[in-house]
Amino acid sequence: MTQVVNVVGAGLAGSEAAYQLAQRGVKVNLIEMRPVKQTPAHHTDKFAELVCSNSLRGNALTNAVGVLKEEMRQLDSLIISAADKARVPAGGALAVDRHDFAGYVTETLKNHPNITVLNEEINSIPEGYTIIATGPLTTDKLANEIVEATGKDQLYFYDAAAPIIEKDSIDMNKVYLKSRYDKGEAAYLNCPMTEDEFNTFYDALMEAEVAPVNEFEKEKYFEGCMPFEVMAERGRKTLLFGPMKPVGLEDPKTGERPYAVVQLRQDDAAGTLYNIVGFQTHLKWGAQKDVIRLIPGLENVEIVRYGVMHRNTFINSPDVLTETYELKGREELYFAGQMTGVEGYVESAASGLVAGINVAHKMLNKGEVIFPRETMIGSMAYYISHAKNEKNFQPMNANFGLLTTLEKKVKDKKLRYEKLADRALTYLDNYKQTL
C-alpha cells in the first residue's frame, strides 16, 4: 500500500491521528506550519503544544474526562501516554510538564518510520485521504477552503455558548413546561422569578467576576451575540426585554405572568441535558455557578459545560460530519479536534484517535469503527454528529450526560458515575475485541 494520508495540523488531535495511522502501517504526511508561520497563541515549534493550562483535568473514574482518558489508554493513545510520562503533582488532576509532554509527542512522531513531517503552510485541502486538525486558529485561506468543502454557513469563528446542565439536577417542582404564547409543542422548561428573586439575581450578576480575554481573541469577541452580563450592564430591566422576557410564559399553575423567566432548552437527543437560553457568558466558572444557582429550580443544578465566549473555528458538525468524523458526501476527507465541536485537550485528542483509526480501516479495507454510545469516546462522536440543537450547535466537552442512561436509575450521583464508568470500560473492552 503506497497511498499516503495527509494530516494537517500537529496539535493534540492531529498528533493523535497521525500516530494511530502510523501504528497501523499507514504512511502519513504530518503537515504543520509552525515554525514557518506561527500563531498568536503558540510559542514553540513542538507538536501538541498546550497553549493554555497544563492540566488535562480530572483523572478519577468518577469524572467524565477521567473515564475518557482511561478509554484512550486502553486504545494506545499517544497523547495520554505522553501525559502519563510527563505528569506533575496536581492532586486528582492529570497535569503535565508542558515542555516534556510536547517534547515526547514530537520525538515519537518525528522518529516514527511511517511519518514524514512537512513544515509548511497549506492554503488548500490536499487531494486524497486527509484529516484536517488545524484547531481554533485556522488560517483564513484554509478556512475559506473548508467553507467550500462543508457549505456556506457551516463554519463558525467564535464560541458563544450558554451553560449546559443535567436535567436530573433541576427541581421540577419549581419549573414548568411551556413554549412562548403556547406556540407549537411545549418545548422549554421555564424557571419563573418574582421581582425580589430577579433583583437578587441581578445584583449578584453585577458583582460576578468576568474572565480575562486573550489578546488574540479580542478581534472576534463581540461579533454576533453579546454576553448576558454585558447586556445586563445596560440597565436593571434590559434582561427583562431579552433572554428573561416573561411575556407569553404565564405559569400554568397560577395563570399569572412571572416578573422574569429563565428558559431551558433541550440540548441532546436523549433529553438528559438542557442549555440556559440566551445565557452565553464570559463570567468565570465559579461565578457562573453562583449566579445560576440563584435561579428558582436550579439551586442544586449540576453544570456539565460552562458558558464560554472565545475565538474558535469549528464546523456545524451535526449537519456535515458522521460518527467517524468523516465529511458527508466526501469520503476521503475527515476532521478532528476542536474544529469538530469537541471542547478540551483530551476530547480533541480523542476525536483524532477515532478519525485516525477510521481512515486506517478504510485504507486497509476494514469496516467503520463506531464506538458504542455507552463509552465516553463513542458518546462524544455521537453528539457531534447528532446534536439535537443543530441550528445553534456549540462545542461540548466530555460529561456523563452524554452517555446513554443506566437501565436502573441510581439516585446517588457518585454511585451513578461509578456505574456509568464501569459500564463504559466494559463496553469498550468488548468492542475492542472486534477491531
From Swiss-Prot:
Reactions catalysed according to its record: uridine(54) in tRNA + (6R)-5,10-methylene-5,6,7,8-tetrahydrofolate + NADH + H(+) = 5-methyluridine(54) in tRNA + (6S)-5,6,7,8-tetrahydrofolate + NAD(+); uridine(54) in tRNA + (6R)-5,10-methylene-5,6,7,8-tetrahydrofolate + NADPH + H(+) = 5-methyluridine(54) in tRNA + (6S)-5,6,7,8-tetrahydrofolate + NADP(+)
Signal sequence, renumbered to the chain: none
Entry's Gene Ontology cellular component terms: cytosol
Coiled coil residues, start to end: none
Keywords: Cytoplasm, FAD, Flavoprotein, Methyltransferase, NAD, NADP, Transferase, tRNA processing
Entry EC number(s): 2.1.1.74
TM helices/strands, residue ranges: none
Disulfides per UniProt: none
Entry similarity comment: Belongs to the MnmG family. TrmFO subfamily.
GO-annotated biological processes: tRNA methylation; tRNA wobble uridine modification
HAMAP family per record: TrmFO
Official protein name in the record: Methylenetetrahydrofolate--tRNA-(uracil-5-)-methyltransferase TrmFO
Cofactor(s) of this protein: FAD
Gene from which this protein is expressed: trmFO
Function: Catalyzes the folate-dependent formation of 5-methyl-uridine at position 54 (M-5-U54) in all tRNAs.
Binding site for FAD: G9, A10, G11, L12, A13, G14
Molecular function via GO: flavin adenine dinucleotide binding; tRNA (uracil(54)-C5)-methyltransferase activity, 5,10-methylenetetrahydrofolate-dependent
Subcellular location, record wording: Cytoplasm
